[in-house]
């Protein structure tokens, strides 16, 4: 089992750790966070307003974080180059601070003995992988990779299925997205984009997202054919993608449902889900899929122009994919 270090114990850092313990697929051996001391880590890991209390044991013992009886080394370094990952036995590092998202910055982890780095965010220059879409293109010469964004992980599997069967001529995506830590609780300053600084709990906020364009990086045939935007809405978790696209081959909506359902039960099982139930956002809290197609919510204008809806737990689904990507990478060592 691959030994993993986590840099940044925020929403994704903590949930990747939860996903690792839930799945037993990877071994968390070290955590670095300069802003959270050991006893605070115990508290933050144990209690979660969104996903509930951790179903297991967590305590501090001999200067280590002990989860389900497993001792985890704790570092509190601000500079990634100073984290002694090698000493803790960490081979892979999940870079989940949201700060060190370029090859150069994330590469600092290699200095401390890490063999590979997985950036839990989109990256300007690191190769991006989406499980179920282009993970097979990974090869072990790559030391630094990105798991793309939660929204790209939702959109790409759906876009792949639709494009493989019917061809996407062009498409626009809107994600109706839950609040995240970058937003403000009440109106406050936001450097580049003024609207982003408005109170998260009281507004629908139009925002930018690179998620749709990023699909073109993981599915090259769709490069330049998709773009999109976001609405940030006052919910704590779970988001939904609305993909409106023009199809090359004509397709009845029932045919689209059929191919998505087949994919969800076959090659994309566990990644792309499918439901015909009358669901709402809360129904996907703590769901581990990257994307769940909502068959009843989509509409077709005609055989070439459709709107497709897919839900995702933007925290937990994504965190589970980070774990899956590491498992896949470890299989190529």
Swiss-Prot record:
GO biological process assignments: antimicrobial humoral immune response mediated by antimicrobial peptide; cellular response to type II interferon; defense response to fungus; glucose metabolic process; glycolytic process; killing by host of symbiont cells; microtubule cytoskeleton organization; negative regulation of translation
Gene3D superfamilies: Dihydrodipicolinate Reductase, domain 2, NAD(P)-binding Rossmann-like Domain
Post-translational modification Phosphothreonine, affected residues: 73, 151, 175, 180, 182, 209, 227, 235
Modified residues (N6-malonyllysine): 192, 213
GO MF, one example: glyceraldehyde-3-phosphate dehydrogenase (NAD+) (phosphorylating) activity
Crosslink feature (Glycyl lysine isopeptide (Lys-Gly) (interchain with G-Cter in SUMO2)) location: 184
SUPFAM superfamilies: Glyceraldehyde-3-phosphate dehydrogenase-like, C-terminal domain, NAD(P)-binding Rossmann-fold domains
This protein's record includes keyword Membrane: no
Record keywords: Acetylation, ADP-ribosylation, Apoptosis, Cytoplasm, Cytoskeleton, Glycolysis, Immunity, Innate immunity, Isopeptide bond, Methylation, NAD, Nucleus, Oxidoreductase, Phosphoprotein, S-nitrosylation, Transferase, Translation regulation, Ubl conjugation
PROSITE patterns in the cross-refs: GAPDH
Alphabetical list of InterPro entries matching this protein: GlycerAld/Erythrose_P_DH, GlycerAld_3-P_DH_AS, GlycerAld_3-P_DH_cat, GlycerAld_3-P_DH_NAD(P)-bd, Glyceraldehyde-3-P_DH_1, NAD(P)-bd_dom_sf
Site entry: Activates thiol group during catalysis: 177
N6,N6-dimethyllysine modified-residue sites: 3, 64, 192, 213, 225, 258, 261, 332
The keyword Endoplasmic reticulum is annotated on this UniProt entry: no
Family named by the database record: Belongs to the glyceraldehyde-3-phosphate dehydrogenase family.
Subunit note: Homotetramer. Interacts with TPPP; the interaction is direct. Interacts (when S-nitrosylated) with SIAH1; leading to nuclear translocation. Interacts with RILPL1/GOSPEL, leading to prevent the interaction between GAPDH and SIAH1 and prevent nuclear translocation. Interacts with CHP1; the interaction increases the binding of CHP1 with microtubules. Associates with microtubules. Interacts with EIF1AD, USP25, PRKCI and WARS1. Interacts with phosphorylated RPL13A; inhibited by oxidatively-modified low-densitity lipoprotein (LDL(ox)). Component of the GAIT complex.
Protein name (record): Glyceraldehyde-3-phosphate dehydrogenase
Gene that produces this protein: GAPDH
């Amino acid at each position: 089992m691959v030994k993993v270090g986590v840099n940044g114990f925020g929403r994704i850092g903590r949930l990747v750790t939860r996903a690792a313990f839930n799945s037993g697929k990877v071994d968390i051996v070290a955590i670095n966070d300069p802003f959270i001391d050991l006893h605070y880590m115990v508290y933050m890991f144990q209690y979660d307003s969104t996903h509930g209390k951790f179903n297991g044991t967590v305590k501090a013992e001999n200067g280590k974080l002990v989860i389900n009886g497993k001792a985890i080394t704790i570092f509190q370094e601000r500079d990634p180059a100073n984290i002694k990952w090698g000493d803790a036995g960490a081979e892979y590092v999940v870079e989940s601070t949201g700060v060190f998202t370029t090859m150069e910055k994330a590469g600092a982890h290699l200095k401390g003995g890490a063999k590979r780095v997985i950036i839990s965010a989109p990256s300007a220059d690191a190769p991006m992988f989406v499980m179920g879409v282009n993970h097979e293109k990974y090869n072990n010469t790559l030391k630094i990779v990105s798991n793309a964004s939660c929204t790209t992980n939702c959109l790409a599997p759906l876009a792949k299925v639709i494009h493989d069967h019917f061809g996407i001529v062009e498409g626009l995506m809107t994600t109706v997205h839950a609040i995240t830590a970058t937003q403000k609780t009440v109106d406050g300053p936001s450097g580049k984009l003024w609207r982003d600084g408005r109170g998260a709990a009281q507004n629908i906020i139009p925002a930018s997202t690179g998620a749709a364009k990023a699909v073109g990086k993981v599915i090259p045939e769709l490069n330049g054919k998709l773009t999109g935007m976001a609405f940030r809405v006052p919910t704590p978790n779970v988001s939904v993608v609305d993909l409106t696209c023009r199809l090359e081959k004509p397709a009845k909506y029932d045919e689209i449902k059929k191919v998505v359902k087949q994919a969800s039960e076959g090659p994309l099982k566990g990644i792309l889900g499918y439901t015909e139930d009358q669901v709402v956002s809360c129904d996907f809290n703590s769901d581990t899929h990257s994307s769940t197609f909502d068959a009843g919510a989509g509409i077709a204008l005609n055989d070439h122009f459709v709107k497709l809806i897919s839900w995702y737990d933007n925290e937990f689904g994504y965190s589970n994919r980070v774990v899956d990507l590491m498992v896949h990478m470890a299989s190529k060592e």
